[in-house]
């Protein structure tokens, strides 16, 4: 098991070499610090506690401050342990390089809060009949039909009723990593993930153990823009541009044509 703590930045879209548009979520994964190592002998299970995002020392209580001192790091804001993650030492840094494009991950976060909601929005119940006796004062169309059996004399635990919707721990499984940017500490994940922008998330290796997918080949936007500029120049010199030609192959031909043109001008 491996994992890392991150922060949701937002959603965008990218393109593959075949022109397919893919919606992705950008997750900022600044280097995490191993703040505690849990073992079976001492704790009854093994896990690795990670911490990320700096926090003012005056806002940290003494037990946590002592824990950070042992790890030889500064106080952190977001602390979570990942069970089954082993092989790391106290104070060691964990960054985005532990993942690669094509891997499947499970992402856990706090879902967006939506306030008080009725049973139709909260539990996806059906709207009642709007005619033939339904929709009257005694039978509103959006009200739950029944709260239970007449003989029970109570409402059983777990009955779907109106209440607060969202703002709860949510996990989405088997999300594909499209790109890993170790320079900017970013992960691009295919699809949406729980939580609002700037909310913290836990990214873990997928527990279902599905096979890793082949990495999606993304279009290089800089290369495409540069190639378009070179093609326009090549047209002026009647240079033949073939399918699959790269800017590295086309650029020398254009330079050669420009030098020949300059030499003819000097004559």
Swiss-Prot record:
Residues 124-147 are annotated as: Disordered. Belongs to the universal ribosomal protein uL3 family. GO terms for molecular function: rRNA binding; structural constituent of ribosome. One of its GO terms (biological process) is translation. It comes from the Bacteria. It comes from Mycoplasmopsis agalactiae (strain NCTC 10123 / CIP 59.7 / PG2). InterPro entries: Ribosomal_uL3, Ribosomal_uL3_bac/org-type, Ribosomal_uL3_CS, Transl_B-barrel_sf. SUPFAM superfamilies: Translation proteins (SSF50447). The lineage of its organism: Bacteria, Bacillati, Mycoplasmatota, Mycoplasmoidales, Metamycoplasmataceae. NCBIfam families: L3_bact. This is Large ribosomal subunit protein uL3. GO terms for cellular component: cytosolic large ribosomal subunit. One of the primary rRNA binding proteins, it binds directly near the 3'-end of the 23S rRNA, where it nucleates assembly of the 50S subunit. Keywords: Ribonucleoprotein, Ribosomal protein, RNA-binding, rRNA-binding. Pfam families: Ribosomal_L3. The keyword Ribonucleoprotein applies. Part of the 50S ribosomal subunit. Forms a cluster with proteins L14 and L19.
């Amino acid at each position: 098991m491996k994992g890392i703590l991150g922060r949701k930045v937002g959603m965008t879209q990218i393109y593959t070499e075949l022109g397919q548009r893919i919606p992705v979520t950008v997750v900022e994964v600044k280097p995490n610090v191993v703040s505690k190592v849990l073992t079976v002998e001492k704790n009854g299970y093994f896990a690795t506690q990670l911490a990320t995002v700096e926090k003012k020392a005056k806002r940290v209580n003494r037990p946590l401050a002592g824990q950070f001192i042992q790890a030889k790091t500064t106080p952190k804001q977001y602390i979570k342990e990942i069970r089954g993650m082993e092989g790391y030492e106290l104070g060691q840094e964990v960054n985005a390089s532990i993942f690669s494009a094509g891997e499947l991950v499970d992402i856990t976060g706090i879902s967006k809060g939506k306030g008080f909601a009725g049973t139709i929005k909260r539990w996806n119940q059906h709207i009642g009949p709007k005619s033939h006796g339904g929709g009257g004062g005694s039978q509103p169309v959006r009200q739950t039909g029944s709260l239970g059996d007449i003989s029970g004399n109570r409402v059983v635990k777990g009955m779907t009723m109106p209440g607060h919707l969202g703002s709860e721990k949510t996990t989405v499984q088997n999300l594909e990593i499209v790109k890993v940017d170790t320079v900017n500490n970013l992960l691009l994940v295919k699809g949406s993930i729980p939580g609002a922008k700037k909310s913290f998330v836990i990214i873990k290796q997928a527990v279902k153990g599905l096979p890793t997918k082949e990495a999606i080949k993304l279009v290089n936007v800089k290369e495409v823009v540069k190639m378009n500029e070179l093609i326009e120049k090549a047209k002026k010199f009647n240079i033949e541009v073939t399918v699959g030609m790269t800017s590295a192959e086309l650029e020398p031909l254009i330079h050669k044509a420009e030098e020949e043109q300059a030499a003819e001008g000097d004559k």
